[in-house]
Swiss-Prot record:
InterPro entries named among the record's database cross-references: MPN, RadC_JAB, RuvA_2-like, UPF0758, UPF0758_CS, UPF0758_N, UPF0758_YicR
Species assigned in the record: Serratia proteamaculans (strain 568)
Family stated for the protein in its record: Belongs to the UPF0758 family. YicR subfamily.
Protein name, per record: UPF0758 protein Spro_4842
Molecular-function GO terms, alphabetical: metal ion binding; metallopeptidase activity
Residue ranges of the motif JAMM motif: 176-189
PANTHER family associated with the record: DNA REPAIR PROTEIN RADC (PTHR30471), UPF0758 PROTEIN YEES-RELATED (PTHR30471:SF3)
Superkingdom per UniProt: Bacteria
Length: 227
């Protein structure tokens, strides 16, 4: 029996056809993964394989960040798939980095969120990161400022202001992760944000947003009207 590839599917079911007709954003995680995998193996359709892998790993993120040996231990995956997926992940990260260094980060908040998610979501402890922006809101650099435990991180507003001055930043975006996976901000998150905003105001440095990164989700203080 031959491998069950996408080319054997009816057009109405083929992810490639759906992508060309409606765009990549119209596809589910499983459909995107099926395009990457190309074929299944005897008795298992490529779409079935994609769905099985997402169920086994728990999410697309956990699949893409899996250890090499763990990744290759799953039937249908191997060194070639691992190398290609890591290359795709790195290309996406470099694309975000390059774009944000040249464009206004606030013109495409979703891209900024994806970029910050790629920086923070793999951490098993809370990490507080700052994006330093110029007066056109282009990214100068990012810095992981503080690291904490699995449930909290201590943040010092003075240190953030000091680094902003070093970077000659006109504005900043704050971000930190919740290793629990739930992105809903805590009362402490709102309090420290207020403290950072007040510290930056004294030097006319704007805090444009504070993003809380969970597993597959992100909460923006700016979008909620908290800044």
């Amino acid at each position: 029996m031959s491998s069950q590839g996408i080319t054997l599917w009816p057009d109405t079911l083929a992810p490639r056809e759906k992508l060309l007709r409606y765009g990549a954003s119209a596809l589910s995680d499983a459909e995107l993964l099926a395009i990457f995998l190309r074929t299944g193996f005897p008795g298992v359709h490529v779409m079935q394989l994609a769905e099985q892998l997402l169920e086994q790993f728990g999410s697309l993120y956990h699949l893409m960040s899996a250890d090499h040996s763990v990744f290759c231990s799953h039937k249908g995956l191997g060194n070639s798939s691992y190398s290609q997926l890591q290359a795709i992940s790195e290309l996406a990260f470099r694309f975000f980095s390059s774009h944000l260094a040249q464009e206004n980060a606030m013109l495409n908040p979703r891209m900024t969120q994806h970029y910050l998610q790629s920086l923070l979501v793999h951490h098993e402890r809370e990490v507080f990161l700052v994006l330093f922006l110029d007066n056109q809101h282009r990214v100068i650099r990012h810095q992981e400022m503080f690291a904490g435990t699995i449930s909290s991180v201590v943040v010092y507003p003075r240190e953030i202001v000091r680094e902003a001055l070093k970077a000659n930043a006109a504005a900043i975006i704050l971000a930190h992760n919740h290793p629990s996976g739930k992105a809903e901000p805590s009362h402490a998150d709102r309090l420290i944000t207020e403290q950072v905003v007040n510290a930056c105001l004294l030097l006319e440095i704007r805090v444009l947003d504070h993003l809380v990164i969970g597993r597959g989700e992100c909460v923006s203080f700016a979008e909620r009207g908290w800044l």
